[in-house]
Amino acid sequence: MASSSSNRQFSHRNANTFLTYPKCPENPEIACQMIWELVVRWIPKYILCAREAHKDGSLHLHALLQTEKPVRISDSRFFDINGFHPNIQSAKSVNRVRDYILKEPLAVFERGTFIPRKSPFLGKSDSEVKEKKPSKDEIMRDIISHATSKEEYLSMIQKELPFDWSTKLQYFEYSANKLFPEIQEEFTNPHPPSSPDLLCNESINDWLQPNIFQSSDERSRKQSLYIVGPTRTGKSTWARSLGVHNYWQNNVDWSSYNEDAIYNIVDDIPFKFCPCWKQLVGCQRDFIVNPKYGKKKKVQKKSKPTIILANSDEDWMKEMTPGQLEYFEANCIIYIMSPGEKWYSPPELPPTEAVHSDRS
C-alpha cells in the first residue's frame, strides 16, 4: 500500500553544505571526523567545525563541508551524529558561511583545504584580479556546482548566458530535470480503508492478485484493467491506493516516469490524446517515448499493468476501430460500472442512527 506520509520527501544536493547542530556539546574534532567519514563517497575536500555558546549557556555546533562531488541525499537523518540532528542547508556563499562560523567560536577544528567561493563565474576568487572572460564551459561548470534547485539552475543560466537561455531553453530544461529530478509526492488516501461496493467484486480481486499484489516471473506479461463509469464513485482514489504508481491525468508526461512503480494509472485522458496506448494497455517492455522538453528514451524495463479510468462520455471503446478494440479486449480486463456501484463501502452508521434510519 502507498505510504501515508503527506510530506514531500527531503532532498539535498550540493558540493557545499552548512550544518547546524542545536544544543550539541560534541567536540569539534570528533564531529569533523564523523561527518568526514559519512561523505567519503563524494570525496570530501574541506570541513570546518566550531562550537559556540547560546546566550543561555547551552552549546551548539556549526559545520561547513566541501566535497568534490555534490552530496546527494534524501534522508534528513543522514548527518545525525551521536543522536544529534542538524539543520541541513546548501552553503550558497561559502566565504560568508565560513566567516560566520569563525565569528565567536569556543573551539574550532579544520581538515583539508578551504575552497573559496569564486566571483560569479569569473574563474577567479574575490581577491584576485579579473584577467579574462570565462568560457561557457567554466560558467556552466560553476552553475552546476552551486545550483541547489531546478529553478535556481535555470535562473543562473538566464542571468549569465541570456542568449543561450533564450535559444536553447528546451535543452537546459532537460538537463535541469536530470540534475534535479522531481520528487513525486506519495499519494495519501483521504478516506478510511474500505472495500469496493461492487456487484462483481470477484473479477476485480482476480485481476489484483496476479497483476498488483503477487510478484511474477520477469518473462511473464501482465494484464491491464479498464474501468468506465460515473464520476464521484471513488475510481481514482481506489486505483491510487493500491501501491507505488505512475499517475497521469489530462496528459501523459514521461519526464518523471518512475521505473520502480508497480503499475501505471491513466485517469480521465481521452483515447485520442493517449500516446503509446498500445504499449501501456499491452503491458509491453522497453518501448521508446518522447518526453516533453527531453530526448527520446526507453522505459518500462519489465511488464507493468495500467489501470485506465474513464467516465461514460469519454469511453475509449467508443472511439476505437474494430482492430484497436480487438487488441484492447485481448490485453485488458474491462469493468463497466452498473448504477449504484462505488469503489468504497459506505460508512457504517452508529446503532442509534441505524435504528432511526430504518424507522424513517
From Swiss-Prot:
Q: How is the cofactor bound?
A: Divalent metal cations, possibly Mg(2+) or Mn(2+).
Which portions of the sequence form the region Oligomerization? 175-187
Short sequence motif RCR-2: positions: 60-62
Domain of life of the source: Viruses
What Gene3D superfamilies does this protein map onto? Answer: 3.40.1310.20
Span of the annotated motif RCR-1 = 18-21
Q: Subcellular localization, per the record?
A: Host nucleus
Domain CRESS-DNA virus Rep endonuclease residues, every copy: 11-114
The EC number(s) given in the record are 2.7.7.-, 3.1.21.-
Q: Name one GO cellular component term.
A: host cell nucleus
| InterPro entries in UniProt | CRESS_DNA_REP (IPR049912), Gemini_AL1_MSV (IPR001146), Gemini_AL1_REP (IPR001191), Gemini_AL1_REP_central (IPR022692), P-loop_NTPase (IPR027417)
* Keyword vocabulary terms for this entry: ATP-binding, Covalent protein-DNA linkage, DNA replication, DNA-binding, Endonuclease, Helicase, Host nucleus, Hydrolase, Metal-binding, Multifunctional enzyme, Nuclease, Nucleotide-binding, Nucleotidyltransferase, Repressor, Transferase
Primary location group: host cell
Quote the Pfam families the UniProt record gives. Gemini_AL1, Gemini_AL1_M
An example of a GO molecular function for this protein is: nucleotidyltransferase activity
Q: Which residues bind ATP?
A: G229, P230, T231, R232, T233, G234, K235, S236
Which residues of this protein are catalytic?
Y100
Where along this sequence does the record place binding of a divalent metal cation?
A: E52, H60, H62, E104
Motif Nuclear localization signal location, chain numbering: 292-303
The ranges of region (Transactivation) come to: 252-270
Q: What is known of its domains?
A: There are 3 rolling circle replication (RCR) motifs. RCR-2 is probably involved in metal coordination. RCR-3 is required for phosphodiester bond cleavage for initiation of RCR.
What protein family is recorded?
Belongs to the geminiviridae Rep protein family.
The subunit structure is:
Homooligomer. Rep binds to repeated DNA motifs (iterons). Forms the O-complex, which is a Rep-DNA complex involved in the initiation of RCR. Part of the C- and V-complexes which are RepA-Rep-DNA complexes involved in the c-sense and v-sense transcription.
The record's function comment reads:
Essential for the replication of viral ssDNA. The closed circular ssDNA genome is first converted to a superhelical dsDNA. Rep binds a specific region at the genome origin of replication. It introduces an endonucleolytic nick within the conserved sequence 5'-TAATATTAC-3' in the intergenic region of the genome present in all geminiviruses, thereby initiating the rolling circle replication (RCR). Following cleavage, binds covalently to the 5'-phosphate of DNA as a tyrosyl ester. The cleavage gives rise to a free 3'-OH that serves as a primer for the cellular DNA polymerase.
Task: Give the protein name, as stated in the record.
Answer: Replication-associated protein
Task: Identify the species of origin.
Answer: Maize streak virus genotype A (isolate Nigeria) (MSV)
